[in-house]
Amino acid sequence: MYFEDYVLSIQYFNQVIRLKPYLSEPYLYRSIAKIQLEDYQGALKDCNASLERNPFSPGSYYARGYIYRQLERWEDAENDYNEALRFSPENRTYLLLRADTRAQRKLYTAALEDIDQLLKREPQSATIWSERGRVCILSHDTLQALEAFNQAATYDKTNPAVWSQLGVTNLMMQREDEAYSQLSQAIQLGSKWAGDYINRGIIHYHRHNYRGALSDYDQAVRLSPNDADTYYNRGVMRQEVGDYNRAMEDLDKAIDLAPERTEMRYQRGLVEMQLKQWKEVVSDMQALIARYPYFLPAYYLAAQAKTKMGDQAGAYRYRKQAQDLEEKKEQIQSGQAQPNTDLIVADAQPQKKDHRKEFSAHAAQNQQEPTEDEQKYDSQTRGSIQKRYQDVVNEPNISLSYYSHDMSLRRTNYYHPIVDQLNRSEALPASLRFTTQEMSLTAQMVDFHFSEINRLTQLIDATPDAALLFARAIEFAVIKDYASAVDDCTRAVVMADRDMEVVICFCRACWRERMSEPDYELTLRDYDQVIRLQPDFAFAYYNKANVLCTQRNWRDAIDHYTKAIAHDSDFAEAYFNRGLTYIYIGENEKGLSDLSKAGELGIYQAYNLILRFK
């Protein structure tokens, strides 16, 4: 884990757990690896298993508390930090995390008690003073927050985050001169946080320094190109100076990035009015009214647009609704939500540590240099692989071939005694392997297989038997002539003994699916025949489930994936595909659990899907 190869780490912990399932540490460390991959359901199961084996481990409570925080189960997180502190009462990290968890629960007094306890031990810690200021901001005590941030700046004058926090706090208190000076100090110290430029841009805007505001917003966009607030603020500023087309571009981008922020549509409506886009104005105001039915300016803007469209009746309806609401001003002002259509202040720059890194460092103590096996997976499996986009597609069928890619990372048991016995008999020119992905052939290899087809054809013409016909079928399949491969299997199966019939029917089913016009009914019959002759042939259940998915027969597909897993509890592909099927029919909890298991068993692509679907 020191080298951030979390997928490979999980495989090693799997091996330890198989050998010594009574140990608590492998479950904890596997949980930590899953935390790095943001598989919090899987990590939670492992933490629970660790604590079942050793309920006196503060690290396990710490890790589980972190997981609960990510799942926003704040009370459970606090309970775990209480347990961790019971065994390690002086631990700084545990206290800080409990304070933050209490703040999330709006238990501000209790959170400040934890922080003050730390300040007694470390009165000159800028980090702890900053945390105190942050909790005070959450409790709307800006004076106490300002005092705490000033203390932080006293002890750490070169940290841009401290000056950012001071700047935001003063901006909230409408002390713009102080805020401007502090935000500029943060930027001068090398701040890479877009919020500093956003907030200083707001001050420029209030001072009518539009050139300065635009310069700061441009820099904020460069630093954080997917931040909706930056585009929104720049759009408002551009509207102010009459640059309506570019204002529209910014507001469109802001709403694309944050479609749930309906309040942004009001400013876009104002720009649309200037651009004479009357229908778009009405559409935006309707969306805004649906979210904020007591926001009167939306009714009046929609009425103006209707008037411009010549729809006087529609304009009257909007004005009448607004006038009716005017009579309920007291009700509106006493509790009805109103959108904020002003410039948006960026929150204080977070100073939180990435505790996932801390977990990883803890777990990787005493690790040695990477072995040859570890280096093998460098490019694909290291780091935050959950951030790498993966298509939402099933794992492919498992077939038999002479050629296969290395799949040693996966824990699926790519073995069946019938196939092993066939390989040992040397009835075929080479050994068959189970695979989900066959190797591409070079031109030289293709020529070799054509010559093999010619050689086998001469032997079959002389003395046809099941082994020769099946061998030629495999050669046809290798060069992708699946129709000829299926024909040879059909001739071979009537001559074959029971064991060879199992293998031939399985291969024929796989190849039928690859034909240009697959016959799924015959394919399913072949898989059923394999299952009838050899009920423990897990790959037949799995492939049949894949066919059922293509036919949108989700429940039967799930049933067959489950049967495949019953015969191989480490069948990674079956867990993965069953997980996607559950998610497709809306059973996300079961689906995420299966994807977590698939990731644990080596299908690292599952972690990106867990991140997207959780």
Write out the residue ranges for each language-model feature.
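Structural marker of alpha-solenoid helical repeat scaffolds
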Residues: 19, 53, 87, 121-122, ...
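Helix-start (N-cap) detector for alpha-helical repeat units in TPR-like alpha-solenoids
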Residues: 24-25, 58-59, 92-93, 126-127, ...
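Canonical tetratricopeptide repeat
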Residues: 29, 63, 97, 131, ...
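Eukaryotic alpha-helical solenoid repeat scaffolds
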Residues: 273-274, 279, 283, 290-468, ...
